[in-house]
Amino acid sequence: MNELNFKGIQIGSNINGKNLNDSDFLPIFEAASDLGASIFVHPWDIMGKEQMNKYWLPWLVGMPAETSRAICSLLFGGIFEKFPNLRFAFAHGGGSFLATIGRIQHGFRVRPDLCAIDNNRDPIDYLNKFWVDSLVHDFDSLTYLIKKVGDEKIVLGSDYPFPLGEAIPGELIEQSKLPNQTKENLGFPY
């Protein structure tokens, strides 16, 4: 990374079917942390895609769930605790994670025997530990992201060159009635 002057890497939401908290990935996370690198997580190899063979469901439903799976595996697996300075960012507004944080937190509280086996810290405590991108396709969803994590934890998303990306990156932000400072914080110069 240093030789090529890279600031970070992109990985999938799972690697060869292994969740991101798998011990095989600890050396990668340790090296990234030591280098001060960022890790961008994009969903791929979607779980359950065999059951979603019509209507483009793997991309419409599977990808948001896959991203939530990645975030949950990292936080329940204690990766944010092991590497507190490691910077993670997640595509598509963090998938379904932020929309289901209440359910995730409730599950953690009522079933710690299943959820808190590797990390006993409340999932809600992690909302300021990572970034998400702005590509959520809907102003209400973008407003919700801002409410949950703050505009300083949201980066401009494009999903280029994929068809679910914005044709003009940042168009949703540009056309919104958000304050100019918020737009700038989201990576869109007003």
List each model region and its residues.
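Catalytic pocket-lining loop regions of alpha/beta-barrel enzymes
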Residues: 2-153
